[in-house]
Amino acid sequence: PRGGVLNARILWSFSAAYRTFGDESYLKLANKSQRYFIDTFIDKKNGGVYWLVNPDGEVVNASKYTYAMTYAIYGLAEHYLATGNDESLKTAVSLYHVLEEKGREPLYDGYVESFTENWEKLDQYDNNAPKTMNAHLHVLEAYTLLYQCWKDNGLKKRLEFCVDLFMNRIYDPSRRHFNLFFDNEWNSLVEMDSYGHDVETGWLLCEAARTLENQDLIEQTNQLALDVTEACLAEGMSDKGYMIYEKKGDRKTKHASWWGQIETVIACVNAWQISGSDVYLQSVDTVWTFVKDHMVDKEYGEWYSDCFDGEPKKEAPKVSMWRCPYHTVRLGVEMYNRLK
């Protein structure tokens, strides 16, 4: 089967690559991805995005996930910025309205993790958490990009809500980490730190504040990003030079994901740009050296998805529901735009 998240990320990747580098081959693939995604994954009856289809386009799983909705908005908004395609913007705006109408939780606000095909609430959620940091991170990410191409006041208010939510509800300043899983009333359910999500959220909050052009918010998110990045470097860096995946309770894994290393590099460059401290560039060099030595497949290309205690898991697929060009392309785009 083919996933809505994977295909939305493919759409974003080739659109961003074309917008940044101008290669016509990227444009061709971006346009092909846009057409396929709109024709195949948009639920024209119930609104939203299908989770899974088979290779013939037949729907396999029509459940609605906030996560898939946000990546669809993200990919379509990027395609509009890259090409000026009105259909992409209109579809992204339509999905935004669906998410606001059907995905928001009315009592305590925020966005519920998942729904049935026709947007009915579920009796059970993954990790028993109706609200997650990860889903809201990608709402923040998608709304930031959508606001760059559609200056709607309602969208602006929802983006401001997302920034405030992360800074004052999801973030735990005593630990300098973001909580991950929540009940409906925003009580944290699990004691767990995800270092890749932490550092990614830090720099994405900075981008949201800059997009909102709010100087006070820019200063606040800059400081938060520095605090989070510093904490993750102190607690999450292994002695072999990679950012570990997570800590559950007092136990740290020895697992390194490809995307966690990427987000660490971006976060450290962002922290260096904010602070001017070369300490962050030294961390970039440490992680990037590990990546080149252990995570890049020098024979067949691309990156290995995972390493365990420094050794790559070579049998893991390079393309899957959760494995795509999005993080690696974004690394190239961010480094080019930040360092050119």
What are the residue ranges of the model-derived segments?
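Glycan-recognition and catalytic cores of secretory/periplasmic carbohydrate-active enzymes
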Residues: 1-340
